[in-house]
Amino acid sequence: ERVLPLEDRDCATVVERAFKKRGVDVFTGVQLEKAEVHKQGVHLTFKDSKGVTHQLDVEKVLSAVGRAPNTEDLGLDRGGVITERGFIVVDEHLRTNVKGIYAIGDCAGHQLLAHKAAHEGIVCVERIAGQGHGGIDYRNVPNCTYCQPEVASVGVTEEQAKEAGMDFQVGKFPWAGIGRAVAAGHVDGFIKVIRDRRY
């Protein structure tokens, strides 16, 4: 259990360390038991990942527990389109199980990102026009997390490379080695490259 569970473990470590350095208390794997709104803010009662109960008074609460697809009123069941947890199931060419029906964007799952949806739209229209040349490899969709320090990634994480049994090398360069980062006073972080040894 860590902050940024979908990002590379090294990234999560740097972000958590930066948060703690700024005095941010970090709790992961918590289960919220009660949130009581008061004039001064919100009183929270929650259990941490070890089952220990904590109470915390905060000004505001931001709940970031994911997003749900908005596909309920599309009549997908009447058309026989298969969904999984509300997302429309598609192949690498954005085709559903029903001939002639495609799906792109958030309703089709994967990363819920605007630039991913735009690319899916292009791939889908090319396929419909008979000019499709390939599908989408979701490993090549860039991601970012807006925090300080910022996190950006594309491709597989080190953990994913290990799980896939890839023969890979890791290259890592400290952010503090970049003059602009030093000049800006933002030296936390690194650049990390996971390279398949075949290439």
Tell me what each language-model feature is.
Residues 46-51, 92, 195-197:
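Short acidic, glycine-rich loop/turn motifs
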Residues 38-39, 84, 196-199:
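Short acidic-glycine loop/turn motifs at beta-strand connectors
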Residues 25-27, 102, 169-171:
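General small-molecule cofactor/ligand-binding pocket signal
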Residues 37-42, 98, 184-189:
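A short, glycine/Asx- and small/polar-enriched loop/turn
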Residues 54-80, 153-199:
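C-terminal catalytic lobe of FAD-dependent flavoproteins
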Residues 1-54, 111-118, 124-160:
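Rossmann-like dinucleotide-binding cores of NAD(P)H-dependent redox enzymes
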Residues 55-130:
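FAD-site-proximal beta/loop scaffold in flavoenzymes
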Residues 106-113, 147, 176-184:
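Glycine-rich phosphate/pyrophosphate-binding beta-alpha loops
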